[in-house]
Each structure stands twice: as structure tokens, then as C-alpha cells.
Regions:
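Bacterial N-terminal signal peptides
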Residues: 1-5
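Bacterial signal peptide processing site
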Residues: 9-12
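Acidic low-complexity intrinsically disordered segments
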Residues: 14-144
């Protein structure tokens, strides 16, 4: 469930997890050449950070749970320019864990994507408890 977008830099008490190192998303003019986004209903690519955005930049999106008692959320970011995710580049599968048990739609999990000249980063925060959440790369390459 997507609910709100917040632009700007965020202070983090933990280092964000690297989504993509040596990313080709940034062009010579220090702007993004592709969009960074997520998959929405029907395999549609929904851009969060659009091409032409000056870097460094950050974007936060607030997610919630779809089921009662859900303790984790899967986030699959993509980069590209096509309207369908199947034609864009998947950047991995990231499991956000440690969400407190609550009725669906109650937890507020802020996921922040940051693009620097060299990297794309992801971090997550439980807005209710004001606490950073743990993120696992599903293929086991990294853990925050």
C-alpha cells in the first residue's frame, strides 16, 4: 500500500544498504539518465525518481502492510525508462523485517532511496516507533 512521497535528505542512524554499486543511472551532467521506481499492479513501472533529476538525491515513500500481523515487506526497485517492469532492470529483492504486529494498513514504514554519483541505496524506518528497520537482500548478498 503506497501512501505518501517525501523528498529530501534524511539522517540515518544506520548506514543504508547498497542496492547497486557503480550504477549507470547517473550521466555525465550529474543527472539521472533513467528512472528509479517500483512495480505496481499489472507489472507497470511506477517511477519514483525521474530521469533528469540532479544527484545526489533522496526520495522517501511510506508503505504499509496488506495483511493483519504482517511483519515484513518486500521491495523490488527497478531502473529504466519503459512503462513495464519486464523491460527495465530489476535491482534485487529487499525484505524489510521487524515490523510490529498490527492490523493491516496500520504500520507506517518509510523506505528511502538515495542516488549518489556512484550508488543507489535503500533504508527503512518504522515511523510509529521511530526506529530503523533491518533490510535483507533476498539473494543473501548483503544485510543491513
Amino acid at each position: 500500500m503506497l501512501s505518501v512521497l517525501v523528498f529530501g535528505c534524511q539522517k540515518q542512524s544506520r548506514a543504508p544498504l547498497v542496492v547497486e554499486d557503480a550504477t549507470p543511472i547517473v550521466g555525465a551532467g550529474r543527472t539521472t539518465t533513467e528512472a528509479l521506481g517500483i512495480e505496481t499492479l499489472g507489472g507497470v513501472f511506477t517511477p519514483l525518481i525521474k530521469p533528469g533529476t540532479t544527484v545526489p538525491c533522496s526520495l522517501s515513500e511510506v508503505f504499509s502492510t496488506a495483511a493483519d500481523g504482517q511483519s515484513q515487506i518486500m521491495v523490488i526497485p527497478f531502473r529504466g525508462t519503459n512503462q513495464l517492469v519486464v523491460s527495465n532492470h530489476a535491482l534485487g529483492r529487499f525484505q524489510i523485517v521487524g515490523i510490529p504486529s498490527a492490523p493491516r494498513g496500520t504500520p507506517q514504514v518509510e523506505v528511502t532511496f538515495t542516488i549518489t554519483v556512484r550508488q543507489i541505496l535503500i533504508s527503512a524506518r518504522d515511523l510509529t516507533r521511530k526506529a530503523d528497520l533491518e533490510i535483507h537482500r533476498v539473494n543473501g548478498e548483503s544485510k543491513l
